[in-house]
Structure formats: structure tokens, C-alpha cells
């Protein structure tokens, strides 16, 4: 395997290179003076135990069969129960590509920067959790193995009809993960799971109960990344003022600059309006809209950014009920602020960062401070338009107006005042491409049509791709919206869309993205599918 770059949702990047017995992760952001790179190493290998039948065929004990290269075999005879002797073979081989349930991983070593450059993490357990999360983030971005399982009961079943199983990886209690009570802490954080859910009889974490831990693909993508991602705090923090990152904090705010041969002028080094306040208040500060284009900050401003360098996970609002128009429903949390990015993720198939931010009423363009992909963005001139100008240009296109109607100046001011919904702008590397609405189904007209079938925390989406160059990526941004809905509140069980019945293109994209068609619904203004 060749080295590859992993782009994290918060903008951090790591170079992953194969090393002896596993892979090395080197940070591209934690620059320091030492020669030894900052990062860690993981050991990944494949363990397989097979039953050899009398006819020479094999079946995996844990339900997976793969073509085997040469490796270490250990054969033992077992009784099949009908008097016929069978052999079990256990094989450990180097990791080549992911298997369905036979891969094993542990963190073998960790290299941290000097404490003279970066302060120690506030919690060593949090640091190990982030390292394991990043390692799993890389692993579950590999090519997914075949879902078919070859078990003892199905060894004569055709391959296309064999049962399917979860994609998961075993986490071995070894190396860095041998720390006292570390595995139980990671399990309580939701990062690890075990099928041994009894109390047990051991008084510590040294028994087999804590040695059989695993992470499945399904559970990993349901974990909020904000729970694990953070950055180390520099001993000398970078300045939020553009152009002055190399100046000491206690230097004068202005330096004399020669202009001609007769006089000196003071070059202003004051911060750009809003940037310093943004750094001081995050997370939670409103995004400034009076910053000139092209100004960059020291760190990408994402939902993961915090000046305290701690994880930015916030639990959902506790359950309490209220009434709206004689409808009883849970009290909803306030959505993010206008212009605030609430979702960010790198999409490898596109090679760009997908972001969603709340639409803004500002007459000025909303600046983008989020992470950027490795290539220059498409159509950067769109970032110079305000949200109102973007919507007006998108509504003017016949394919959009056919389903959304004509644009009016009151459209966006009306939507931002809705209590059960908020508008969003989708971006590829900071360039706007579409308009979306995220709403609570129960208080929406959809909830009224469904009657009592709408769940308390079901979400709904209205979608519109305004730019022609961004079409054809529906599966990527659709799964991003669903991912945000499911991770921001784990009580959300359903994400609904009700496109018009003649919108064949979006119906096709929904089928390809994993949505299921429930039924047709009759609204006062349309027939939906």
C-alpha cells in the first residue's frame, strides 16, 4: 500500500504509511523542531479460524471465508457431533485488505511533540480515544469487503445466497491500549463494544471479558466526531491576526515602514474586524460577515474548533414538552446561528470538503473559514455573493422554479423565523452549490398529514441543487445531511423527504442513497412520493 493522506472533518490531515507490521500515522499539522515525527503506529493483522470438512471445503468459525495466501496454520481435530472428525485451522497473516470480521488492531506506539512546543492533553484518555477514532476513521474508509459470510451451516449454499454480516474489527488489548482501566473507559465513551454484557466476576480489566472488544462500521458512523476530535494547545498560541503570526504577543501593534526617503509611516497591524472576537468567543460566536475575502485564520473554523482545545460535543436538549398550534411536541433546541458551519466532512470520492452552514440575511457574502481540499475549488466567484443573491440566481433557473416557484425578497426572512425549521447552504470547499431546509417532522405540514405516525424526533429535508456543476453528487451531500441528523440527536430514528411525484431525478437519487419509499401523500399543494 502506498502512503495516503487522511483528511479529518476538523481540517487536520495525517499521512498514513505502511510500516513493518502495520501503519504509521504522521501529523501534517503539529509542526515542531524535532526530527522524530509526531504521530503513532498501529498494528493490523488478520486472524482466521476455519473448520476443514471431510470433503476438503472450509468454513470460517466466525462466519467469514476468504481466499488465503500462504501463512501460519495451526490445525486441531474437533468433533462435529456426528462422530466425524474435523480440523480447525487458525491462521494469522499480514493485513492486505479489510475482511468482514477477521481483522485485529491495536496501537503499538505513540510519539508526542515536545512540551516546550505543545502542552500536554487535558486528558490522556481523551488523546488515546482520538487516536483510536482517527485510526478507525482511516480503516472504515478502505474498500468495504464482501458482506457474504461463509459459515458451517452455509458452506454448501451458493455465494450469492449466503447470509450477510456486519463489518467490524477487533480491538486488541495490547501496546498503548494495555493501560489500566483504559479499555473500560473507551467502552463507556461508546467507542468500543463487546458481546459479553454481564457484570462479570473480575475486579479489574485484566480478564478475557475486556479482551474481546470490537468496533463495527455501523456503530462507528453513528458516533459524533465532536466527542473525540480536538487539537493540542501550542505553548505559544498562533495569533488570530492575519500577517502577524510570527510576531511576539507583547510587540507593538505597529512597526515603522519606510515610504520614500523623507518620512516614515506606521503600518497598521490591527486585526481584521471580527476575527479576534471570533477567536475569543468560539465555540458559539456568530460568524462575522465584514471580513475581506482571502483572509485566512490560523485554524479552520468548523464545529470542532475550540480555543480551549477540547472536544466540542454538546448533548441534545433534555426532553420536555410544549404546545404549538394545539400540537404537543418536544421543546426544540435553537439551531446554529446565521452563517455558522454546523457540518464538515471530507468526501474522498469528490476530493473536497462538504460543509453545511446556516443561511444568512446579511447583504454581504458570508466568509468561509472551514477546511479546504487538496485542489483549488470550483467556481470560487460564487463565494463573493450573498445568500440572497445566490437564491435569486438559483430560483431563476427553470429546473428549480418548476418545483420551488418564483423567488421573492421575503423568502429567506420568512424561513429563518420558523421555529421548527432552519435554512442551510451547502458548500464544496467553501463554494456554495445548493439550498436546503432541515425541519422537525412533527410540527411540519408533513407531520399533520402523517397524523400520529410521526416520531417526536423525526427529521425532514427539503433539497435544491442550484449550481449545474454540482449536479451528480446527490448521494454524497444527501448522506452528509442524514449523517448530521442522526448524530446531532441520537433519538432521531427517521429522516424523511416528500418530493413531488413528478420529480423523477431526485426520486432516483433517493433510491440510490438508501432511502426507502413508504407511500404517496396528498398535500394541499402537491402529491408526494
From Swiss-Prot:
Gene3D superfamilies: 3.40.630.30. Coiled coil: none annotated. It holds the Pfam family Acetyltransf_8. It is found in: Cytoplasm, Cytosol. Its main location: cytoplasm. The active site is at residue 498. Pathway: Siderophore biosynthesis. Substrate binds at residue 462. Its EC number is 2.3.1.-. Disruption phenotype: Leads to increased sensitivity to oxidative stress and iron-starvation, reduced conidial germination as well as reduced virulence. Reduces the ferricrocin yield to half but increases significantly the production of beauverichelin A and fusarinine C. One of its GO terms (cellular component) is cytosol. Residues 59-95, 239-258 are annotated as: Disordered. Keywords: Acyltransferase, Cytoplasm, Transferase, Virulence. One of its GO terms (molecular function) is N-acyltransferase activity. It is an enzyme of class 2 (transferase). Belongs to the lysine N-acyltransferase mbtK family. Acyltransferase; part of the gene cluster that mediates the biosynthesis of at least 11 siderophores, including beauverichelin A, dimerumic acid (DA), Na-dimethyl coprogen (NADC), eleutherazine B, ferricrocin (FC), fusarinine A, fusarinine C (FsC), metachelin A, mevalonolactone, rhodotorulic acid (RA) and tenellin. This cocktail of siderophores for iron metabolism is essential for virulence, and more specifically for the fungal virulence in penetrating through the host cuticle. Siderophore synthesis is also involved in conidial germination under iron-deficient conditions. PANTHER family: LYSINE N-ACYLTRANSFERASE C17G9.06C-RELATED (PTHR31438:SF1). This is N5-hydroxyornithine acetylase sidL. It comes from Beauveria bassiana (strain ARSEF 2860) (White muscardine disease fungus). The gene is SIDL.
